[in-house]
C-alpha cells in the first residue's frame, strides 16, 4: 500500500531524512516514533507530497508520489491526513467542514455529503455538535471532527502527524479511542506519535527514528521487549519509566 525506498531529504545543506526505507501493507497499522527532531513528521508529510524529497522513491497504491506526472491533489484526496493542530475551517460549522471537500473534490451531492458527514460524526461521538463552529468545541472534539472529515473522503489510508500532542491530557483518550476503533476496522494507518500505549495496543509494527534515519523497524512486541539499538533502548527507558 505505502512503500518508501531509500528516501533522503535536505533543507538546503541540512539533511533531515537519510536513506529511509519502510512499507505499510494494506490494513496494517505502523507507528513512527522517536525523539523530537528525528524526522518523523517530515517523513509522513513526504508520503502524500506535502514535503518534497530529493532522493529515493515513495509510492502509495502503486502511484509514485515524487513523479512529476502524478496528480498530487488527486492522490491526496485518497489519503486521509490528520494534523497536530486540527486545521478545521473556523468560519464553517462542523457539518460544513465535513461537506466541503466531498462536494468540491469528490463531486458528491450536498444531501449525500451531509448524510455521510452525519454518519461519521455519529461514529466519532459528535452527532449533536454538527451545527456548532470549531471554536465552540474542545480540542479533543475538534480533533475528532478532523478525523471524521478525513474519513468523509473514503480514504484508502490514513496518516496521523502527532494527533494528540496539542491536547490537554484528559482529552487524549477520546481521540485515541477513535483511532483504536479505526485500526480494528482494518484501516491502513501510519501514525507519528509518542503514545506508546496506543502503539502497544494496535500497531502491527513500530518504526523508530533518530537523526533522520530509521534505526529500527520491528514488530511491536519485539520493539518493546527487545529493542535492538542502544538508541531505542534509551528512548524507551525514558518514555516508559513512569
Located regions from the model:
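C-terminal boundary and immediately downstream tail of ABC-type ATPase nucleotide-binding domains
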Residues: 221-242
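ABC family nucleotide-binding domain
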Residues: 1-4, 8-220
Amino acid at each position: 500500500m505505502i512503500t518508501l525506498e531509500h528516501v533522503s531529504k535536505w533543507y538546503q545543506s541540512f539533511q533531515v531524512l537519510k536513506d529511509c526505507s519502510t512499507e505499510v501493507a494494506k490494513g496494517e497499522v505502523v507507528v513512527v516514533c522517536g525523539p523530537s527532531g528525528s524526522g518523523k513528521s517530515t517523513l509522513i508529510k513526504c508520503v502524500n507530497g506535502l514535503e518534497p524529497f530529493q532522493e529515493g522513491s515513495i509510492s502509495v497504491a502503486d502511484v509514485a508520489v515524487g513523479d512529476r506526472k502524478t496528480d498530487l491533489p488527486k492522490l491526496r484526496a485518497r489519503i486521509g491526513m490528520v494534523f497536530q493542530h486540527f486545521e478545521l475551517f473556523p468560519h464553517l460549522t462542523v457539518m460544513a467542514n465535513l461537506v466541503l471537500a466531498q462536494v468540491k473534490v469528490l463531486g458528491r451531492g450536498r444531501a449525500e455529503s451531509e448524510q455521510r458527514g452525519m454518519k461519521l460524526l455519529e461514529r466519532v461521538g459528535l452527532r449533536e455538535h454538527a451545527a456548532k463552529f470549531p471554536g465552540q468545541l474542545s480540542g479533543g472534539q475538534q480533533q475528532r471532527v478532523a478525523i471524521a472529515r478525513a474519513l468523509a473522503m473514503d480514504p484508502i489510508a490514513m496518516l496521523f502527524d502527532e494527533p494528540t500532542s496539542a491536547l490537554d491530557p484528559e482529552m487524549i483518550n477520546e481521540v485515541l479511542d477513535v483511532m483504536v476503533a479505526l485500526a480494528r476496522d482494518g484501516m491502513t494507518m501510519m501514525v507519528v506519535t509518542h503514545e506508546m500505549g496506543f502503539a502497544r495496543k494496535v500497531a502491527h509494527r513500530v518504526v523508530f527514528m533518530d537523526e533522520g534515519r530509521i534505526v529500527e523497524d520491528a514488530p511491536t512486541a519485539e520493539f518493546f521487549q527487545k529493542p535492538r539499538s542502544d538508541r531505542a533502548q534509551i528512548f524507551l527507558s525514558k518514555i516508559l519509566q513512569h
